[in-house]
Curated annotation (Swiss-Prot):
It comes from Bacillus velezensis (strain DSM 23117 / BGSC 10A6 / LMG 26770 / FZB42) (Bacillus amyloliquefaciens subsp. plantarum). InterPro entries: Ribosomal_bL19, Ribosomal_bL19_CS, Ribosomal_bL19_sf, Translation_prot_SH3-like_sf. GO terms for molecular function: structural constituent of ribosome. The gene is rplS. Keywords: Ribonucleoprotein, Ribosomal protein. Gene3D superfamilies: 2.30.30.790. One of its GO terms (biological process) is translation. Pfam families: Ribosomal_L19. Belongs to the bacterial ribosomal protein bL19 family. This is Large ribosomal subunit protein bL19. The keyword DNA-binding does not apply. This protein is located at the 30S-50S ribosomal subunit interface and may play a role in the structure and function of the aminoacyl-tRNA binding site. It comes from the Bacteria.
Length: 115
């Protein structure tokens, strides 16, 4: 039974996504269905956490929209994500960047590294 579950989940894992870590700035292209139309919506922000593994792995992206912080959690292997672009690679020393929630303006900047 365990082998069967592993085989099914292995088929659904995505391999077309770039490598990214907390601190990186991503542009996530999400498929949104409105009535009978489907369109692509772009959500750009900083990865503040990545958790889980395998098919249940998720990541959370945070951005500031009109002065209000917006966080959105995506499953990594969902078909709703059309593509992910890495805009910048950030250098951080934590796996979970919850402290960014309290910071405003220039204090919330993350140092960029070249990869």
């Amino acid at each position: 039974m365990q082998k069967l579950i592993q085989d099914i989940t292995k088929e659904q894992l995505r391999t077309d996504l770039p490598a990214f870590r907390p601190g990186d700035t991503l542009r996530v292209h999400v498929k949104v269905v409105e009535g009978n139309r489907e369109r692509i919506q772009i959500f750009e922000g900083v990865v503040i956490k990545r958790r889980g593994g395998g098919i249940s792995e998720t990541f959370t992206v945070r951005k500031i929209s009109y002065g209000v912080g917006v966080e959105r959690t995506f499953p990594v292997h969902t078909p709703k994500i059309a593509k992910i672009e890495v805009v910048r690679y950030g250098k951080v020393r934590r796996a979970k960047l919850y402290y960014l929630r309290e910071l405003r303006g220039k204090a919330a900047r993350i140092k960029e590294i070249r990869r």
